[in-house]
Amino acid sequence: MKVLNRHNRKINTTPGIAASILDSLSGPEDRLWPHENWPPMQFDGPLGEGARGGHGPIRYRVEKFTPGKKAVFRFEPEGLAAGLDGIHYFEITPFDGHVLMVHVIEARCGLVMWLKWSFVIEPLHDALIEDAFDKVENRIAGKQVKSSLWSPRVKFLRNMIARKRRREEKKRAA
């Protein structure tokens, strides 16, 4: 089965500023990834081809990195992404005097993974990416101008994940 998920946002900024935001991804001064409310994107080295890592239980490696333009990640066959065969990427494109910021997932998977994607991963992913684009817009504006609301489903899923994490931590502490 095919998974195709696309988010884009027209950002009122210059290509140079957008490029520096993309290039900060997963670094100590990350201005794109919404690590304030989501697991941080981390790699075993700097953002560059071959670096391995991910965010939370989603594992991937950097397949291609074109500074200031595009970062392509290939899912690893482990963690929550096990069963997703494909890529996801961020891309910056000049557009009508602004910048179009894009995030795309293109993957294939079996039925079980597709169900997991549809009911659990996709709603969380969608909220995370919208939070990332909000972070960029707010940073550029220098104030809070955009704040996407999480759906009741996203709030429920985040609550269930947090409860599971607390139970696992209690077991390890015992």
PLM features per residue range, with description:
Residues 17-28, 62, 73, 101-103, ...:
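Hydrophobic pocket/interface hotspot
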Residues 11-16, 63-69, 91-102:
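A short, structured loop/turn motif at beta-sheet edges
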Residues 45-55, 72-80:
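Short beta-strand segments that buttress and anchor functional surface loops
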Residues 77-138, 145-149:
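Beta-strand/loop substructures that line and gate deep hydrophobic ligand-binding cavities in soluble
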Residues 4-6, 55-60, 83-89:
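Short, surface-exposed coil-to-beta transition loops
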Residues 1-44, 160-174:
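Hydrophobic ligand-binding cavity/cleft-lining segments
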Residues 27, 54-58, 64-71:
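Short, charged/polar surface micro-motifs in flexible loops or helix N-caps
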Residues 138-174:
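Hydrophobic secondary-structure block in the mid-to-C-terminal portion of proteins
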